[in-house]
Amino acid sequence: VLSPADKTNVKSTWDKIGGHAGEYGGEALERTFASFPTTKTYFPHFDLSHGSAQVKAHGKKVADALTNAVAHMDDLPGAMSALSDLHAYKLRVDPVNFKLLSHCLLVTLACHHPAEFTPAVHASLDKFFSAVSTVLTSKYR
């Protein structure tokens, strides 16, 4: 459960990310593919090379979904319902992959914003990404 302090940390961090969210989403996705090669199996139709336009575009989709989640932190299940359906019923993404991408998002954000990435912010973002992952995998059961 996200505390009021967690919500404040997530919102303020996401505000600082601003227009870079799509760029960071693409970088985190590329980092996920490089660090956890099995995640590539869901994207056989993508050019997965460094700097790929397809990876960047999908990373922007990830970032846009997270921006929506930040805006609706008090109703993540409602805000993410369609994405949950897509990933559970159509794409059938292994739930562990959300945790792997979340880790890579944390690393990417820490690399770009080291001064703002305090232990408290790290913990809040980790809890937020975990909450989003839980919602995205809730329909698997």
Swiss-Prot record:
List of residues that carry N6-succinyllysine: 7, 11, 16, 40
Annotated Gene Ontology cellular component terms: blood microparticle; haptoglobin-hemoglobin complex; hemoglobin complex
Biological process, per Gene Ontology: hydrogen peroxide catabolic process
Residue ranges of domain Globin in the record: 1-141
Positions of heme b binding: 87
Phosphotyrosine carried by residues: 24
Taxonomy, superkingdom: Eukaryota
Tissue-level expression: Red blood cells.
Modified residues (N6-acetyllysine): 16
UniProt: O2 binding residues: 58
Phosphothreonine carried by residues: 8, 108, 134, 137
Keyword Protein biosynthesis in annotation: no
GO molecular-function terms, A-Z: haptoglobin binding; heme binding; iron ion binding; organic acid binding; oxygen binding; oxygen carrier activity; peroxidase activity
Keywords in alphabetical order: Acetylation, Heme, Iron, Metal-binding, Oxygen transport, Phosphoprotein, Transport
Phosphoserine sites (modified residues): 3, 35, 49, 102, 124, 138
Subunit structure: Heterotetramer of two alpha chains and two beta chains.
Protein function: Involved in oxygen transport from the lung to the various peripheral tissues.
Family: Belongs to the globin family.
Protein name as annotated: Hemoglobin subunit alpha-1/2
Species lineage: Eukaryota, Metazoa, Chordata, Craniata, Vertebrata
